[in-house]
């Protein structure tokens, strides 16, 4: 039986996607090779200054957003969160790290490094921001992530300079829009029939996967 594909959309600056890594890890431990995550990106923090100035204008701006995130993190004791998140460092855009990560994904597809390197870099990128409060929109931070994962930045630069990483990222953003992705994180299963958005509990994701394992045919709609 082929592994069940889970198309996973996220924005690397989204704290709920950072929390959702716990669910992704649990799914991988439980199902192993029976599931396959397909990592894609959506744009939630494409222009962070505008987003915060509009969505949080009457709620304390960056200070209010910081308090909101720290309160949300209190429900996830396993998670490490820097107390000055979004205060000491304010990344301008998630597009920059997304572009870097798409270049890594292209490199994995073409055999430049292992297919698991994207996951390693993605985890490191999120940890660098949410745990260390470093600016992940800065290319110097990208170089450090690449170095820790033994990624050749010359290869990454080749995919970016050729425009291929831009094209791949544009495809992600467009497909997110076409698929009705409302935000980050979003899990899509069963060729789009099952869409799980936001702070979704592990048991809900598990129930959707179990249903597909019982009835894997794409011709038969799931009850979930």
Residue locations for each model-derived region?
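Structural alpha/beta surface segment adjacent to cysteine/selenocysteine redox centers
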Residues: 19-130
């Amino acid at each position: 039986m082929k592994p069940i594909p889970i198309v996973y959309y996220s924005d690397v600056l989204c704290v709920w996607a950072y929390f959702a890594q716990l669910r992704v890890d649990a799914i991988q431990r439980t199902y192993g090779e029976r599931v396959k995550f397909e990592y894609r990106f959506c744009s939630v923090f494409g222009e962070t200054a505008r987003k915060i100035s509009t969505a949080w204008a009457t709620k304390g701006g960056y200070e209010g957003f910081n308090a909101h995130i720290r309160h949300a993190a209190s429900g996830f004791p396993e998670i490490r969160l820097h107390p000055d998140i979004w205060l000491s460092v304010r990344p301008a855009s998630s597009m920059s790290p997304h572009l870097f990560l798409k270049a890594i994904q292209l490199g994995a597809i073409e055999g430049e490094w292992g297919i698991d390197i994207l996951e390693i870099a993605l985890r490191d990128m999120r940890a660098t921001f949410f745990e260390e409060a470093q600016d992940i929109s800065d290319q110097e931070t990208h170089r450090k992530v690449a170095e820790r994962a033994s990624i050749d930045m010359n290869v990454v630069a080749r995919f970016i300079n050729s425009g291929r990483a831009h094209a791949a990222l544009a495809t992600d953003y467009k497909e997110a829009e076409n698929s009705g992705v409302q935000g980050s994180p979003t899990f899509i299963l069963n060729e789009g029939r099952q869409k799980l958005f936001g702070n979704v509990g592990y048991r809900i994701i598990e129930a959707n996967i179990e249903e597909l394992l019982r009835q894997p045919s794409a011709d038969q709609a799931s009850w979930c």
